[in-house]
Amino acid sequence: GHERTAHFVTEYEDMVAHQDFDEYLKELDEYREYYKEWVKRVDACYAKNPEIEWSKVLEICGENRWPGPTGPHFEYRPYGLYESMLIRVAPYTIKGALYYQGENDENNNEIYDILLENLITEWRRLWHDDELAFSIVQLPVHDPDTEKTGRGWGGIRRAQDKICRTIKNTSLTVITDCGNKKNIHPTDKKTVGER
């Protein structure tokens, strides 16, 4: 499966190959300051009107320049979370993993099963446990327009289902009925947690 996903690493390496590290750090500091101020404006919008729609928030606060400059501290670099977070907790004993992600991979839904299988394999290797339990929370329905096309999150859900049917000691928590069209994060946390 790695040959179909190797482009994530090569694209990143090409982007940073000739990067001036000092210039990158300067851009990163500027971005972090900008982002902190942008979040304050967004929080103020929601404090005034908790029911405000996201499009209106963007109209008032301006577009977000997220996710910031690409470089060695870029949170979405290949293996970024693995290197900055997962390795730190890997020595500790766990019974399993509850995995509730995939929203940002809707453009990769054709290979999401490979990405998820690789992730499970790597985590099991890291914890030295070929039987490490994985409970995958299936993405909810969020945008009915893309759902009709069979792309977007629908493709991710199909990949999540496939993985749970083909990889041992995995399970799937279905929450398709818990979505919210106006909020990417379902507000009904209790139902999701109970399942």
What residue ranges belong to the model's regions?
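Cell-envelope and extracellular/periplasmic
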Residues: 1-195
